[in-house]
Amino acid sequence: MKNVTDSFVFLGHWPSAGSFGFNTDILATNLINLSVVLGVLIFFGKGVLSDLLDNRKQRILNTIRNSEELRGKAIEQLEKARARLKKVEMDADQFRVNGYSEIEREKMNLINSTYKTLEQFENYKNETIQFEQQKAINQVRQRVFQQALQGALGTLNSCLNNELHLRTINANIGMFGAMNEITD
């Protein structure tokens, strides 16, 4: 009876260094598997993730540059509009008697259309930046999930085979049979 109890105690502990045995502690086994999977993901995924983020950063920076160029063009148009405004104001002084209200209305329309154009360029820039950022985040999430899944499947496939399953099942059947003998 003592030998049977000693064999169960031996099966419940980690095997000593240099020997082979089964770890029946499911919680400890899962922690080891998780730490191995996370280590592999961090080791292999770091380079791919940084390359992906660098590429995305370059695209966003290019988009920002393009938006800044558009903004510069809008400012240039604004300056041209201001020059035209000055000209219109000079003409207004000359034609004040004939139609001051008409010139004032034209001036306001010109200013409003210029500011609307500038606001549209600014909104376009902000929407483009926000879209590119969200797209980058979604792609990174998808890439990390795919790599994690591939790594986990690879680890599981490399660790589990038919012989290991059969030996584990046989060991558990033997332990169950020994437990039935003890209770009988």
UniProtKB/Swiss-Prot annotation:
* TM stretches of this protein: 27-49
Annotated signal sequence is none
> What InterPro entries does this protein's entry cite?
ATP_synth_b/b'su_bac/chlpt
Q: Tell me, what is one Gene Ontology molecular-function annotation carried by this entry?
A: ATP binding
Location in the cell reads:
Plastid, Chloroplast thylakoid membrane
Q: What is its main location?
A: plastid
User: What is the membrane topology listed in the Swiss-Prot or TrEMBL record?
Assistant: Single-pass membrane protein
SUBUNIT field: F-type ATPases have 2 components, F(1) - the catalytic core - and F(0) - the membrane proton channel. F(1) has five subunits: alpha(3), beta(3), gamma(1), delta(1), epsilon(1). F(0) has four main subunits: a(1), b(1), b'(1) and c(10-14). The alpha and beta chains form an alternating ring which encloses part of the gamma chain. F(1) is attached to F(0) by a central stalk formed by the gamma and epsilon chains, while a peripheral stalk is formed by the delta, b and b' chains.
Other information: In plastids the F-type ATPase is also known as CF(1)CF(0).
- Can you name this protein? ATP synthase subunit b, chloroplastic
Name the source organism.
Spinacia oleracea
**Gene for this chain:** atpF
